[in-house]
Amino acid sequence: MNSFKYLKPKLFSVMKNYTKEQCLKDIISGLIVAVIALPLSIALAIASGVNPEQGLYTAIIAGFFISFLGGSRVQIGGPTAAFVVIIYGIIAEHGVAGLTVATLMAGGMLILMGLFHFGDLIKFIPKTITIGFTLGIAMGIVVGQIKDFLGLSMGAVPAEFVGKIVAYAHNIKSISYVTLAVGILAILIQVFWPKVSKKIPGSLIAILVTTFLVAIFKLPVKTIGDLYTIKAGLPSFTMPTISFSLVREMMLPAFTIAVLAAIESLLSAVVSDGMTGSKHKSNAELVAQGVGNFMSALFGGIPATGAIARTAANVKNGGRTPVAGMVHAFTLLLILLFLMPYASYIPMSCLAAILIIVGYNMSGWRTCMRMVKTAPNSDIAVLVITFLLTLFFDLVIAIEFGMVLAAFLFLKRMSDIAEVRQWTYKGSSDDDKLSEEVDLKYVPKNTIVYEIFGALFFGAANVFTNFEHGEGKNVLIIRMRNVPVMDISGLEVLEEILETCQKRGLTLILSHVNEQPYHVMGKAGFIEKIGRENLCVNIDASLERAEKLGETQKA
């Protein structure tokens, strides 16, 4: 039962001290965030290859459950730009039915991640990988909008990055300059509107202005209504047809959705923690994300996760409890019921412009450039490779390869800093220098002392075989206070050293063995082999033990 307290939604704990004043702030913030989410939800749905209302279904259903069950006070859930390229690719290959099954499976995976406390493992994904795949996704989003932004007369846009570029190049002569002008106007409005008001999103103003201009002047610009039939009304429950072959086929896409949802939602939660001074429950958040995606799929939605920009807007506008996220969902529901038909007049180039700005903002190119200038070459290599794999292949391959590469490079660095040092012995003429040698001890003449620095693991095991046993010595002390961890390869090195010492008539003494290496030795029976009396708590005890052995030998 104790472990399940980490899954308790934040809503249930914050409501104990809930006030009318905070309720009013949450309602106002929820309304503002809904206004921000409206154009984004529609634009992201269309860019993903589904109907506009499906973006709102996602923001309403997933957004509600992510707030209601989540481990963050202020998380706002819904469709995000990070999923656009992934969803588009899934639909192109497996259809909407495949996307629904993948989203259901991803929801189940996220719930299991939360139940098994995987939320704490996300922190082990290096920042270079998250920056790399985020930049790759952002680039894919921007490139995916070129058709609608330029008004190109062409068929369906290929899912692959290279295929998109080739298709655009073949159809570049069909550009519509009126459509381009509307798109540029939408971008300019989004760039400069924040100087007028930061409360009302520039994307909403861009939609209102461009829709008005296209309708009044009857401009030859394609609108949502030209391409989609928009449905107003409540989403209907639909149970997809599921077969074993389809489940097996959708396992990788589902895993991609689950991993990305977990990473983005927990990153958003961490950002909001920094803004509010609170602390989220990562495993409860994963369970909420799973339930949100599961329910979204059953009611015609698409994958969802925590949206960093909308969550930040929630905090800035006074939202401090999950009530704000729930108000945001109910507000979007009212818009869906009563205002959705008017969305058919929105120009496609305006939506493309909105997503181009979203892609630009999420790219984090400034952070990327700073890292390229300051980070080690190995980190830059991980970033660039992850970016390219995301762009030209897919997110799972990028993360898997990036993690393996980052792990190998880390092990290489750990191996490079590992070393063995033999203690230096000073003569009586060097007494004036003794005070500077903090670790300098009296060492019996029968003893030779080595000190190991670094992890004693397979990548550095060969470094620790360079021991000289010395002539006329009968005791070898290995000081291990700077060995934090050891694996089976490191243990085998110690066993080889012990075997060599026994053949040469030397006693091996280990000094200051840390907890983890001691546990490995005990489990493998090495402590019995070396003798418990030859494992000493510190170097002083080791030297004292060596001196006694020397006296015994003389006697």
Where are these regions (language model features)?
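Transmembrane helical cores of multi-pass ion-transport proteins
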Residues: 1-429, 526
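Short, contiguous clusters of charged residues that form electrostatic/catalytic patches at enzyme active sites
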Residues: 29, 187, 191, 462, ...
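Conserved SAM-binding loop
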Residues: 76, 510, 535
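Short secondary-structure boundary/hinge segments and terminal tails
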Residues: 291, 332, 519, 538-539
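Short Gly/Ser/Thr- and Asp/Glu-enriched loop/turn motifs at secondary-structure junctions
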Residues: 308-309, 515, 532
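The feature marks cytosolic C-terminal regulatory regions of anion transporters and related permeases
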Residues: 361-529, 547, 554
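Short acidic-hydrophobic, aromatic-tinged amphipathic segments that line or gate anion-handling sites
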Residues: 529-545
